[in-house]
Amino acid sequence: MEYNHQEIEAKWQKFWADNQTFRTGTDKTKPKFYALDMFPYPSGAGLHVGHPEGYTATDILSRYKRAQGFNVLHPMGWDAFGLPAEQYAMDTGNDPAEFTAENIANFKRQINSLGFSYDWEREVNTTDPNFYKWTQWIFTKLYEKGLAYEAEVAVNWVEELGTAIANEEVLPDGTSERGGYPVVRKPMRQWMLKITAYAERLLEDLEEVDWPESIKEMQRNWIGKSVGADVTFKVEGTDKSFEVFTTRPDTLFGATYAVLAPEHDLVDAITTPEQVQAVADYRRQASLKSDLARTDLAKEKTGAFTGAYAINPINGRKMPIWVADYVLASYGHGAVMAVPAHDERDWEFAKVYGLEILPVVEGGNVEEAVYTEDGPHINSEFLNGLDKAQAIEKAIEFLEEKKIGKKKITYRLRDWLFSRQRYWGEPIPIIHWEDGTSTALPENELPLVLPVTSDIKPSGTGESPLANLTDWLEVTREDGVKGRRETNTMPQWAGSSWYYLRYIDPHNTEALADPELLKEWLPVDIYVGGAEHAVLHLLYARFWHKVLYDLGVVPTKEPFQKLFNQGMILGTSYRDHRGALVATDKVEKRDGGFYHMETGEELEQAPAKMSKSLKNVVNPDDVVEHYGADTLRVYEMFMGPLDASIPWSEEGLEGARKFLDRVVRMIDNSEISDKNNGELDKVYNETVKNVSERLDLMYFNTAISQLMIFVNATNKAKILPLEYANGFVQLLAPFAPHIAEELWVKLGNEAGISYVAWPTFDESKLVESEVEIVVQINGKLKAKIKIAKDLGRDELEKIGREAVAEALEGKNVVKVIAVPNKLVNIVVK
């Protein structure tokens, strides 16, 4: 048959759509399997070849599980709120909803062209009021539980974007992740979510999920649990004092100065007149920096002396109090006791300002370099000679006994800044009344629909563009009290924190989802997506899930039982002698090398992340047109382990297509028979066993290798049993579903391979029935023969003698050594 991929793929995509092949199964007697992709933001650029890698993995598992008799839930949707659509609307005057709908249509077309087995009846879109009604409902529950609150917060304000951004969206150089704009600190009224109330559970329950250890560790570090002590320091000559949290109370004897965050409440009260100007200037500079820029370990340490002194509570020594931006008001108490001998930042600061460095742990020369290793304590009175653990325990006992400190657990995790000064987001369902109260909208008034406007522009007040829409903004209560709707909208994280629940029951108008269906489908069995979401998205989704668990809405503590992060597909890039990247449209290939078209310089080829600026993005539409969706799927799964980052290769793509061509030829050209001569028994049963085991482990590349081994074996076989041809096509189907469907019908089967029971293997056939043995005379090889396995020594000797009968003529056989399944050695004279 001719392998016309375009015709074959269109034909079977239509068949699946017409027959609703991938509707989620509802047979209560079957086990369930929920395979979830991290849903995409539908950008104007459409899919690139990196997207299908994770989608292909979950699709393979979904097809495999259907054939194994599972009810499979495999949905797709759109994380469609977001700044790019709003920026586009502001730049062009077009409706972000229309722009988003066009992008979704394009994404959906591309996804369908790749043959993914999604149940489109369950499609969700975070911008659909029927979806965000429940996002708003969850917010009202957070509000009722005191987990959503308003606060004056110094936020990361980006003037060019007209909004505040989260700490995680600020780059180390102090610019915004989106657009690279300057970020300044600015106090604003913001909505916060109290994720810190769940810190311990978010930490503990990581033990219950099957996630990569590296991702768990990133979450643990982000939560940042610290066990230590709160210590009270008095300010000399005043009735003032301040608290410091330290994980190393054992080093108090080495605390030689104190540092307050520039925003600390005490700064104004304790700064001496001589230092007021210097401190004010310093605080102004600090306010322009992001938290990330302030705490960057590589940055030069700066500060200002307040003129005041603290008293070290453990030994009564005076300690100068400084203000420095490497201390954050939001962490601990916004104050640190500096132990420069044993802390990198404190040591650097002390060196810059000539402050005392007193070692209290033995080892190293602290005048030359900070010493951060463990060792016995010195210069520490009653702690001398103790190791770290003993000294910490004894120091805390002393502090508590003297009532100058107490044991404390803290977390690095901060409450979640939840509001954005944007139009294109979920409206926050809160009304602020003129009498100073605020109320959440009741459920029967949800969704609070985002008002349509053709003129999205900044409010000029720091509020979102919704502040301009007075008809929507201003409300009056039945008792005549006037109110104003909340103008902040939710961040893009909101919808993605619970969307996996809505897939379970997407058309329910009475509840977020039917409790019985949630019980049936949760938790998600496999969640596949990029490691860039390791901390934020996964932490936020886990937080919301735990709140919903406490409310009795969901039956599980954790949302995602197993997590897998696919690697990145890298593009080709070119670098000049300075290491600068050169866009691919400025490169020409000649004489086996790569050259800059403008300068003529020879360039070095290297893999790099695909990006529009480098013009090295590969569009899956082009690949599907020229090679076919099945080729793309097989190539992306065969290019290496799923979690590895691997460069895109046109040669690899061609190799995948050649493999599928060979599969077609195998079915076309083999003598397919109802009979079985046993030639392929071992390799076929090995193939069923190995492919099944490797699918369970998500070792897709080695599963494909095993399929290739089978195809190679058929080339040497006289016949291909029909049972084995059918079984092979079934094994191929999760990887290359279109061509598998076509070959399935060609083999005489009824159309539709998706629910045909997965092949099984015969354990007894995994063992060879024949073995090759060597026949030697006086230890020299004379023959190799195939014989039945496990023959006895007498039979072996007889067969061996017959095999070399001519060579034995006229010889005297002294003895025969027969080793079953290995050799016959005939000793002659």
Curated annotation (Swiss-Prot):
Motif residue range(s): 'KMSKS' region: 609-613
Keywords from the UniProt entry: Aminoacyl-tRNA synthetase, ATP-binding, Cytoplasm, Ligase, Nucleotide-binding, Protein biosynthesis
Annotated PANTHER family: LEUCINE--TRNA LIGASE, MITOCHONDRIAL (PTHR43740:SF2), LEUCYL-TRNA SYNTHETASE (PTHR43740)
Pfam families per UniProt: Anticodon_1 (PF08264), tRNA-synt_1 (PF00133), tRNA-synt_1_2 (PF13603), tRNA-synt_1g (PF09334)
Protein name: Leucine--tRNA ligase
GO molecular function, one term: leucine-tRNA ligase activity
Protein source organism: Lactococcus lactis subsp. cremoris (strain SK11)
BP GO terms, sorted: leucyl-tRNA aminoacylation
Main location: cytoplasm
Binding site for ATP: 612
Family membership: Belongs to the class-I aminoacyl-tRNA synthetase family.
Database matches in Gene3D superfamilies: HUPs, Isoleucyl-tRNA Synthetase, Domain 1
Enzyme Commission numbers on file: 6.1.1.4
Subcellular location: Cytoplasm
Record-linked HAMAP family: Leu_tRNA_synth_B
